[in-house]
């Protein structure tokens, strides 16, 4: 990669991203972190990363979390306020217990904008048989009542299905993939029968 980009303004650093301290902040971060399960993270490294997550986000993360979770939750130091962050990661965090910390971070610490989920047979990792998703968020305080775009299938720019879901509904949903699997979601009733009719019990036949 260094040879390919030689002669450009791109600076290549070969280092442990999670051990670096941000010496500069950027408007955008695009990442595809390594998919490494917790079994393969050294104990001392895991403890250090858990401490860093708690220190930077105020959130306790499970020791069962994969390495990509730490990447997402420790990335804000590299972003300017209002900066955008885009991640290609496994989608399992949306349903498993260790993903609670990641989902809390996305709803509480940043402004979650969009999650695109690839279909199960559309693998994005050549060396890992996992379903994938793209997560986009902004480094900003989330609005009190904002909406998140959920898309599935196809590409992020040309998905098969598009849904808009309120953040409050996400907070109440344990398994976010349920929001992809069911039919269109009606988050608020636009009208009820009572808006058009007077509803009352009719005459009960045989009541004599």
State each model region's role:
Residues 1-207:
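Signature of N6-adenine DNA methyltransferases within the class I
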